[in-house]
Design a protein with these regions (language model features):
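Helix-loop junctions and terminal segments of transmembrane helices
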Residues: 29, 61-78, 140-141, 199, ...
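Interhelical loop/hinge segments that connect adjacent transmembrane helices in multipass membrane
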Residues: 1-7, 11, 146, 189-234, ...
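Membrane-proximal transmembrane or re-entrant/amphipathic helices at the cytosolic face
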Residues: 2-3, 401-404, 409-411, 418, ...
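Signature of the first transmembrane helix
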Residues: 7-66, 90-103, 120, 125, ...
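Membrane-interface junctions at transmembrane-helix termini in multi-pass inner-membrane proteins
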Residues: 8-12, 69-78, 128-151, 165, ...
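Hydrophobic alpha-helical transmembrane segments
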Residues: 116-123, 151-196, 210-214, 247-252, ...
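Transmembrane helical elements of multi-pass membrane transporters/channels
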Residues: 14-29, 155, 176-179, 183, ...
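N-terminal membrane topogenesis motif
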Residues: 1-30, 68-71, 75-86, 115, ...
């Protein structure tokens, strides 16, 4: 019982600080993005998008397998952390060298002559990531998520200010490059200043092999996932140009800002928490169920409401030149609404040490999605996005399937748990969407939509006595009472 309470306390603390970090940084990022989108043309965003597609795929090699292996391992020590750190640095230098040499060829592939210097400068984020990766794993393993708050917020504020100043001074594409690179650099510097762990002068190839045996499967799975996600942007950029690529990317990024605050919080805190309970299947099932319910309760209404008021919101914040973003934005709102299910199921599988199952699921999902992509690619970016929506909904069931056997929590049980939340979110969105057609200023329409949406969802949750609503209210009350008692 004492162990359970200790785990619960760490989870609550981790969730609080991680959500505060992600929420704060996403608010700042959103404000900076709005300002930059008003200052810069969609074609400039398209150029930088091509670079971030490439670096995002390469960052998978740094961010995925080995860090997760350290977190999943029962009792990693300094030898484990130091071995992974030195391996990462060496590997990141090799990746950057390859990117530096291949930049001219990639410029030809993307039909963008000026891409070479942008690739070579923004590619430095690979080296920065190598310095940060093990520090992040250490924070997650020890569940000291308060450390992330200062690092992320500091990096976001500094890089946002720098990007805006450079954009105002006419630096164009380089304003976006400086923003992204400085964000990574400042974030990493603050982590190094605030975290006591330092790499020791020790290295064990034997220890590294043990971590690789678990981590390489997650690495391949993440590489397949990231490559598949980015291929839509690559195809859109090559076939339909920078502007359409920017509309597609921003349609994806705006819902992602909302989703990321909750899902990154869950993803960071859940894996170490579930790994600590990997030998107690009943406890693991209970925590997975709670994560799906709470995540869905928060994310679904946010994204449903966002999709419903997308047109007046985009027009008000970033002007009419970005209205072609709206159809993509609505599609990605639906996709991301179900991500708490994806993450909770996958984290349960990882916590049990079943990286082989994780990789198998990724291969099956991406195989299905590749078939859908091949069928939709000739019809343009919008039809491709609809195909992505269909494949992501199918992936829900695929991700949930193993947990019916592993922890006795089937896909059908999961759907029953979130059904009231989904239906209430859809009802709220339908009511909010109807207000978009009022002959009123956009700001006033949005204000009415937000107030009505909150009223319908909160009132409906209370009326239906949703378990997630009662749980959140109870948790907040307990935390406040503990704070007063302390």
């Amino acid at each position: 019982m004492e162990r359970q309470n200790d785990t619960q306390q760490k989870v609550f603390s981790g969730l609080f600080w991680r959500f505060l970090e992600r929420g704060g940084s996403q608010i700042v990022t959103l404000l900076v993005t709005i300002i930059l989108q008003r200052l810069l043309e969609p074609t400039m965003y398209g150029t930088v998008s091509k670079v971030t597609v490439i670096t995002a795929i390469l960052l998978v090699f740094v961010d995925s397998g080995m860090a997760n292996a350290l977190i999943q391992k029962k009792d990693p020590d300094d030898l484990d952390f130091s071995s992974v750190f030195y391996f990462n640095i060496f590997f990141c230098l090799l990746l950057y060298l390859a990117l530096f040499l291949l930049s001219p060829w990639l410029s030809v592939v993307f039909r963008e002559p000026g891409l070479t210097p942008v690739l070579r400068v923004l590619g430095l984020t690979l080296i920065v990531a190598g310095l940060k990766n093990v520090q992040e794993a250490y924070v997650k393993k020890t569940m000291q998520f308060k450390r992330f708050f200062f690092a992320t917020l500091g990096g976001t504020l500094f890089s946002g200010a720098l990007g805006i100043v450079l954009a105002l001074r006419g630096f164009g594409v380089w304003a976006l490059v400086a923003q992204q690179l400085s964000n990574a650099a400042v974030n990493t510097a603050i982590l190094w200043l605030t975290i006591p762990w330092r790499p020791k002068r020790m290295f064990s190839w034997w220890r590294l092999q043990g971590l690789l045996s678990y981590g390489w499967k997650l690495l391949v799975a993440s590489l397949i996932d990231q490559g598949y996600q980015k291929i839509y942007l690559i195809i859109t950029g090559i076939l339909q140009g920078n502007a359409e690529m920017a509309f597609f990317e921003k349609g994806q990024n705006w819902p992602n800002l909302l989703m990321d605050s909750v899902n990154t919080t869950m993803d960071s805190v859940l894996l170490p928490a579930l790994s600590a309970e990997q030998e107690r299947k009943e406890r693991l099932r209970s925590m997975t169920r709670r994560a799906i319910q709470i995540g869905s309760f928060v994310i679904m209404p946010l994204l449903a409401g966002f999709a419903a008021c997308a047109t007046p919101l985009v027009r008000l914040l970033v002007t009419e030149k970005w209205l072609p973003t709206v159809p993509y934005l609505r599609i990605f709102c639906v996709i991301y609404a179900f991500y708490p299910m994806h993450l909770a199921n996958l984290n349960a599988i990882k916590a049990l040490g079943r990286s082989d199952m994780f990789l198998l699921l990724e291969i099956v999902k991406r195989g299905l999605e590749l078939v859908i992509l091949l069928c939709t690619v000739r019809h343009g970016a919008y039809v491709m996005a609809l195909g992505l929506l269909g494949s992501e909904l199918a992936s829900q069931g695929i991700n949930a399937w193993p947990n019916g056997r592993l922890i006795d929590y089937s896909y059908w049980k999961q759907l029953k748990d979130i059904a009231p939340i989904l239906l209430l979110s859809l009802l709220m969105a339908a009511c909010v969407y109807g207000l978009s057609f009022l002959a009123l200023p956009d700001a006033l329409i949005l204000l009415i939509q937000i107030m009505l949406g909150i009223g319908i969802y909160a009132g409906g949750a209370r009326l239906l006595k949703l378990d997630s609503f009662d749980y959140l209210i109870g948790t907040i009350r307990n935390l406040m009472l503990k704070k007063k008692a302390g």
